[in-house]
């Protein structure tokens, strides 16, 4: 029987259809008929998305994404209407329901408006924010207890219309009243925030606590290293930094989130890229979670659903394109990760086949990959998946029991479940109101079959046993209490759907009046509503549409269910225990006998809302062996006994210098509720003797390996985890590759193939790409654990360009610079460069346009541009000898932009994009620079420089927010030198930092920064340039700078006059520089050994030959130097500088020297019987290792032998850092000072660093991460300022306006800042980006003006002076000016040439020059003072209005002659 009701047409977007009331005749004998279903169908011309239902409501909601409208049904889907948001202006893009308040829903637009409803979608309001909304991420973060507390983590993404593409910035807000008032913006610098109380399982101290990742105002690093974690529990009235790590604090904040009862924070150390994970359960107390674990790879783990006592992580463990993982859990007691399952099935986006049934303690499902070995050989192989189940939280796993009748004669037979998190029907349907009842798709056999071979299975005992419910792949759902199962066939055209009233044992067919293709099936979120919704595609012959069916069984269930706490026939509920044996309840794997009430399968009734809690109770069981597992730091052996990990025993013995210690080998499985009995010995501590853990002694060990050919380079894959072995790659002169997995003790040949290139990944320390002569590329992403290969898309280029351009944030993205038609003849007419792009680690390649010569990712670690932006060099179509710089953000599919013409080349250095451009005549070479991606500006060089295209630029670095370049000024072969230029912070104006700096014929420059302390660098100059015009030998001298290239001085050797008594005053210490060093030698300094520098050189007027040189050390960052050896040595820093090794580099030797007191005393270790020449010394690049690798040979062409010397056993105890108790700490605070002992001002501050005390006998290991601590701020000096835009700096430090340019107008920029009411007139100077100085010389303190419309606020802050004050000020100023004028006139006649000059800070000035500079510096501020005075007097009589960039002090500046003809080098 059908009862037809008409569905109202809705504005032409829904086709008029009919609903029907379908009465289904019972197929079951008995006095009670099977219930009917009320069925309604509505047809739409576009696909409904974001479908949602509500608890305790008949309302249903969805989004028509094509038109941006929200549709509402108030009768469980029988009828629909749109336009429910009155006054809607912007199309809706996304619907989001409140996580904890079911009646609240939010509608996101891409405008600046968010609509919201607090009554299940019936009535709507809105709030606006300052910028358009980005829906690439879900912006809302909800409070678990107070629904009115909401955080809105928006990202404002804008496109400048230029080649940079889209750039996103944080745009965060919060509300305390559910957006009844305008949302409050988060503090400036906030990038992501959450509530501490963000889970129903959380227990926090303050409900108002907010935790944020925020920009650290004291950090000059790049993101994420510039960000730290802060919290506030008073709505940002106060903000407290979170101290997670002794040295890092919380710098390097990579992410924060909540899961289960845990807050999780991840930090990345900028120096080592090591990942630190911290957990908290109250938002205040945090504990490191990886303390005894080897660690996870950066950006390769996934946080999974968690419980109140454990949370789960899946970590990548294979090829990223066909990934597998390792499942870990962490519990609230130990805060230590434990491996729970290997070879889990992961997806490229990080999702994992994992399912947790949260209301049943310990019940989880996971799919594992059975053919991992095949995938490691060939990542293209399809995965073979099988399912596992655990009932004890991951301690033990088993296959899923298959239905008894399904296996037939198969040897390996179990049930495998479809758990793909990307597919809505690939899940397990369950409900806490129907405990133990599970509904899932899968297949029976030895593996999970394809979707079209899957069936529908049911379990009624929490996954222990399963039955086949329906054949074929289905969409499925069950009502909240399990009263009704509903299913439709999938992957086919159908006209029938099915429902079951007895937990899937039998099914009733409902025939529809049309054929459909089901898409999704939903059950009502209201557990008391027996309603299902089916979304399907239909076809009326003209076009495909979407039908939304609702099936309402609730009205026709014959009775209301009866519930009582006693089991009887009248009770519609039964008592179900979580585990049975022989029909009787027994203790579960979680140490308790637990039961729930659930509706009987035979009861056909509707559950009243008075029934809310079906959890009965549990009784704790007596503990057995099965309730325990190995404690953290222990591992189970073959006999099932828990044995302490060897490295843990060694670590504990070393850290405390113990003879014995106690540990408890066992612990209860997290969440287990059993009660230990008196005889239970599992919790008793076990005593361990340190002698049994390979106790470190004092023996240094060495390992010799003889190669059969010459090794010319060694590549270290140190990775992100210092505790693990470093993977080494050796490259031979014959193009063979060797590898070592044990730090260099033993080596194996990678293959018989010859390799043309070995390219470490520029941004990923775990990765290297190796290219064979046959264009096969081998690569690893996990530090050599697995190597994969692909075929290069073409032969390599023939002109020396780097083969690969690596992306800084997307490791799978590669650009390849190849060639075609060049192998036989690289000069052939059809030989050309080609460029390819891959987004999947080289599995597939796309060729870019054919006229491109070279391309590079534009995004750098400090350059904020679109991820897809690439720069390319393209041949000019009209002139093949001219080239253009172009860009694209879609790999030239639709868009490209031409940036510059006549380009020679380009490079990206941190935040700078640098392009070399030649003029139209081809006679001069210049640079164009961009730092913001919006425009390029031509660099202004000193007037004396005119660089020919055949001359060389060498980009040195940009670590200090200034670009350092070397411009070659003499190109005579063998006598090359040039000038080092330093730019202002935007890279457009350069001053000469140091002239006549040495370089070699290849282009390398004798310029090297001190690692670990910014602003200090060494350089070698050619002192006899006039003698070399016709050839000759360079005479080199070494200089050092402590203020980032503004001043340079000679090196000070302590006792130098005793070393070379007859040398005289012309002798200084000079060092052999970068151009003379082996390409793979260790650097002069390292970040890990801050302040320590070693070099080979001589105390002489000029640098003498290397073989005649001696070896020197500085322990104070280059201020003073000491001789340590009479001959040249190679060296390396081990254990963060606590051990220094050195070995003779010219003469054959079999002895290595080592020092544990920063080179004050040395001991020797004989590493072989035979003496050989040591050609290279190498160690971990981070400087934290304890091993050093020597490459030795008998003569220049003989095969190489490697000697690994292991100093790991030198000290047994691990150093302890105790910031509070300096006497107990093994580290001392070191403050850099100048030669007089005065603390050095570096970047405007006096800083301290921690180094191991030379008097403490311990090993640093990874216990020390060098961190600078600011002790005090310095007064500002001229070194803290640079020239403002459109100004250039003369050699004396004076900033003058560039001829033809105007001073920058920054009024709008300054006044646009929140709460700004005044703007400051530029003076030509601005603070350098890195300085933190305070007070002192205010060179950037220009005249203040009120912002437009803020005059009242301005004059409140700056009251006008009274009449007498003005009169006295004028009289005093006139007298002072008269005296000053006389003094200035006197000195200017004697010493000055008329320029305004800044006082010099150099300690090398003579007294007369110093006095003159001071006088000039003091009185050069008088014109600015008069300008301010004039402005204050004038404002009494003239209405003050904002100026338009006119500078009144310019008139006073013009009273002085600007010395603008002096652009020489310093």
From Swiss-Prot:
The chain crosses the membrane at residues 1364-1384. Residues 34-1363 are lumenal. Glycans are attached at residues 465, 545, 986. Residues 1-33 form the signal peptide. One of its GO terms (biological process) is protein targeting to vacuole. Changing residue 1425 to A: No cpy1 secretion. Residues 1385-1466 are cytoplasmic. InterPro entries: Sortilin_C, Sortilin_N, VPS10, VPS10-sortilin, WD40/YVTN_repeat-like_dom_sf. One of its GO terms (cellular component) is trans-Golgi network. It is a single-pass type I membrane protein. The gene is vps10. It comes from the Eukaryota. Keywords: Glycoprotein, Golgi apparatus, Membrane, Nucleotide-binding, Protein transport, Receptor, Repeat, Signal, Transmembrane, Transmembrane helix, Transport. It is found in: Golgi apparatus, trans-Golgi network membrane; Prevacuolar compartment membrane. This is Vacuolar protein sorting/targeting protein 10. One of its GO terms (molecular function) is vacuolar sorting signal binding. Changing residue 1419 to A: No cpy1 secretion; localizes to Golgi and vacuolar membrane.
């Amino acid at each position: 029987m059908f009862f037809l009701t008409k569905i109202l047409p809705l504005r032409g977007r829904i086709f008029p259809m009919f609903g029907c009331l379908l009465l289904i005749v019972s197929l079951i004998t008995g006095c009670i008929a099977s219930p009917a279903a009320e069925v309604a169908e509505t047809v739409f011309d576009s696909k409904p998305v974001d479908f949602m239902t509500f608890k305790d409501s008949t309302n249903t909601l969805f989004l028509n994404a094509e038109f941006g409208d929200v549709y509402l049904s108030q009768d469980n889907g029988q009828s629909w209407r749109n336009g429910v948001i009155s006054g809607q202006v912007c199309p809706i893009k996304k619907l989001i329901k409140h996580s904890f308040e079911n009646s609240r829903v939010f509608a996101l637009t891409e405008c600046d408006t968010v609509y919201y409803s607090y009554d299940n979608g019936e009535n709507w309001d809105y709030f606006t924010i300052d910028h358009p909304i980005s829906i690439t991420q879900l912006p809302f973060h909800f409070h678990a207890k107070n629904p009115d507390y909401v955080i809105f983590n928006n990202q404002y993404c804008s496109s400048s219309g230029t080649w940079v593409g889209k750039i996103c910035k944080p745009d965060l807000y919060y509300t305390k009243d559910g957006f009844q008032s305008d949302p409050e913006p988060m503090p400036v610098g906030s990038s992501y925030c959450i509530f501490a109380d963000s889970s129903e399982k959380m227990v926090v101290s303050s409900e108002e606590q907010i935790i944020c990742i925020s920009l650290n105002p004291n950090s000059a690093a790049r993101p994420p290293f510039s960000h730290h974690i802060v919290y506030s529990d008073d709505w940002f009235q106060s903000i407290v930094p979170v101290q997670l790590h002794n040295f890092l604090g919380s710098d390097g904040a990579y992410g924060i989130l909540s899961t289960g009862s845990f807050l999780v924070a991840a930090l990345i150390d900028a120096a080592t890229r090591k990942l630190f994970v911290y957990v908290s359960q109250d938002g205040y107390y945090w504990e490191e979670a990886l303390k005894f674990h080897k660690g996870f790879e950066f950006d390769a783990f996934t946080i999974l659903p968690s419980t109140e006592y454990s949370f789960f992580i899946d970590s990548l463990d294979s090829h990223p394109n066909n990934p597998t993982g390792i499942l870990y859990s962490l519990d609230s007691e130990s805060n230590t990760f434990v491996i729970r399952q290997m070879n889990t099935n992961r997806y490229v986006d990080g999702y994992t086949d994992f399912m947790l049934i949260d209301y049943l303690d310990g019940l989880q499902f996971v799919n594992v990959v059975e053919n991992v070995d095949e995938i490691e050989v060939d990542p293209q192989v399809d995965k073979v998946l099988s399912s596992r189940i655990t009932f004890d939280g991951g301690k033990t796993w088993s296959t899923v029991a298959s239905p008894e009748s399904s296996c037939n004669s198969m040897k390996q037979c179990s049930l495998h479940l479809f758990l793909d998190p990307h597919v809505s029907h690939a899940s397990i349907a369950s409900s806490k109101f129907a405990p133990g009842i599970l509904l899932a798709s899968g297949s029976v056999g030895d593996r999970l079959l394809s979707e079209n071979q899957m069936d529908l299975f049911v379990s009624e005992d929490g996954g222990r046993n399963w039955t086949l419910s329906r054949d074929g792949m289905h969409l499925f759902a069950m009502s909240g209490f399990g009263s009704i199962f509903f299913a439709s066939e999938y992957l086919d055209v159908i006209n029938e759907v099915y429902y079951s009233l007895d937990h899937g044992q039998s099914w009733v067919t409902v025939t529809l009046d049309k054929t459909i293709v089901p898409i999704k099936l939903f059950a009502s979120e209201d557990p008391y509503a027996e309603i299902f919704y089916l979304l399907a595609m239909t076809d009326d012959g003209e076009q495909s549409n979407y039908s939304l069916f609702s099936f309402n069984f609730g009205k026709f269930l014959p009775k209301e269910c009866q519930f009582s706490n006693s089991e009887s026939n009248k009770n519609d509920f039964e008592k179900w225990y979580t585990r049975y044996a022989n029909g009787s309840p027994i203790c579960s794997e979680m140490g308790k006998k637990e039961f729930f009430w659930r509706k009987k399968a035979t009861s056909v009734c509707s559950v009243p809302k008075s029934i809310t809690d079906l959890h009965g109770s549990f009784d704790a069981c007596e503990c057995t062996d099965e309730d325990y597992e190995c404690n953290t730091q222990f591992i189970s052996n073959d006999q099932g006994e828990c044995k302490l990990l060897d490295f843990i025993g060694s670590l504990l013995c070393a850290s405390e210098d113990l003879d014995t210690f106690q540990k408890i080998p066992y612990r209860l499985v997290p969440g287990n509720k059993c009660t230990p009995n008196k005889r239970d010995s599992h919790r008793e501590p076990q005593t361990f003797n340190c002698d049994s853990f390979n106790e470190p002694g004092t023996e240094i060990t060495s390992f010799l390996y003889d190669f059969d050919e010459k090794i010319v380079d060694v590549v270290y894959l140190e990775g992100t985890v210092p505790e693990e072995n470093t993977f080494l790659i050796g490259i031979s002169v014959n193009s063979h590759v060797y590898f070592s997995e044990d730090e260099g003790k033993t080596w194996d040949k990678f293959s018989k193939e010859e390799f043309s290139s070995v390219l470490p990944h520029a941004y990923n320390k775990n990765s290297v790409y190796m290219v064979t002569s046959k264009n096969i590329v081998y690569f690893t992403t996990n530090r050599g654990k697995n190597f994969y290969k692909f075929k290069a898309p073409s032969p390599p280029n023939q002109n020396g360009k780097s083969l690969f351009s690596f992306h800084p944030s997307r490791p799978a993205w590669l650009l390849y610079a190849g060639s075609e038609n060049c192998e036989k003849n690289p000069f052939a007419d059809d030989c050309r460069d080609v460029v390819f792009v891959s987004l999947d680690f080289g599995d597939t390649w796309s060729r870019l346009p054919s006229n491109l010569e070279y391309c590079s990712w534009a995004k750098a670690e400090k350059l904020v541009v679109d991820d897809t932006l690439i720069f390319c060099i393209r041949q000019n179509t009209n002139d093949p000898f001219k080239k253009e710089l172009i860009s694209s953000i879609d790999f030239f599919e639709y868009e490209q932009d031409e940036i510059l013409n006549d380009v020679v080349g380009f490079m990206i250095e941190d935040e700078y994009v640098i392009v070399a451009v030649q003029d139209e005549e081809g006679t001069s070479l210049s640079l164009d620079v961009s730092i913001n991606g919006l425009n390029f500006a031509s660099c202004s060089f000193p007037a004396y420089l005119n660089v020919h295209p055949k001359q060389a630029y060498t980009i040195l670095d940009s670590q200090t927010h200034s670009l350092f370049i070397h411009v070659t000024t003499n190109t005579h072969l063998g006598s090359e030198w040039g000038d080092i230029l330093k730019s202002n912070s935007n890279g457009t104006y350069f001053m000469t930092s140091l002239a006549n700096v040495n370089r070699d014929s290849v282009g390398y420059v004798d310029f090297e920064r001190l690692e670990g302390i910014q602003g200090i660098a060494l350089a070698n100059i050619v002192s006899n340039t006039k003698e070399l015009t016709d050839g000759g030998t360079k005479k080199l001298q070494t200089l050092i700078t402590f203020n980032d290239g503004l001043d340079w001085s000679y090196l000070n050797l302590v006792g130098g006059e005793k070393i070379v008594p007859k040398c005289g005053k012309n002798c200084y210490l000079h060092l052999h520089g970068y151009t003379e060093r082996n390409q793979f030698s260790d650097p002069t300094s390292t970040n890990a050994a801050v302040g320590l520098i070693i070099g080979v050189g001589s105390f002489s007027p000029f640098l003498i030959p290397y073989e005649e040189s001696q070896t020197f050390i500085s322990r104070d960052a280059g201020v003073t130097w000491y001789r340590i050896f009479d001959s040249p040595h190679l060296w390396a820093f081990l254990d963060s500088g606590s051990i220094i090794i050195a070995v003779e580099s010219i003469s054959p030797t079999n002895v290595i020297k080592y020092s544990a007191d920063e080179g004050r005393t040395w001991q020797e270790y004989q590493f072989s019987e035979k003496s050989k020449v040591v050609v290279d010394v190498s160690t971990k690049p981070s400087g934290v290792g304890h091993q050093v690798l020597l490459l030795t040979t008998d003569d220049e062409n003989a095969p190489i032998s490697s000697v690994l010397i292991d100093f790991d056993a030198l000290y047994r105890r691990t150093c302890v850092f105790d910031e509070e108790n300096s006497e107990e700490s093994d580290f001392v605070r070191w403050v850099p000072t100048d030669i007089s002992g005065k603390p050095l001002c570096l970047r405007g501050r006096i800083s301290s660093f921690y180094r191991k005390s030379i008097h403490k006998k311990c090993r640093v290991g990874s216990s020390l991460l060098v961190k600078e601590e600011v002790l005090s701020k310095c007064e500002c000096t001229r070194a803290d300022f640079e020239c403002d835009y459109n100004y250039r700096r003369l050699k004396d430090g004076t900033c003058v306006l560039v001829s033809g340019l105007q001073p920058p107008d920054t009024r709008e920029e300054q006044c646009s800042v929140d709460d700004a009411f005044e703007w400051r007139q530029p003076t030509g100077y601005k603070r350098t980006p890195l300085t933190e100085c305070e007070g002192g010389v205010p060179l950037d303190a220009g005249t203040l003006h009120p912002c437009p419309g803020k005059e009242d606020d301005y004059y409140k802050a700056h009251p006008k002076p009274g009449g007498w004050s003005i009169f006295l000020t004028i009289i005093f100023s006139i007298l002072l000016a008269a005296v000053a004028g006389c003094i200035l006139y006197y000195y200017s006649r004697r010493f000055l040439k008329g320029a305004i000059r800044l006082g010099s800070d150099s300690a090398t000035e003579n007294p007369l020059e110093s006095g003159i500079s001071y006088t000039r510096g003091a009185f050069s501020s008088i014109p600015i003072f008069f300008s301010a005075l004039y402005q204050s007097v004038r404002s009494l009589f003239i209405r003050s209005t904002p100026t338009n960039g006119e500078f009144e002090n310019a008139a006073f500046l013009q009273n002085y002659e600007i010395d603008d003809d002096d652009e020489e080098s310093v």
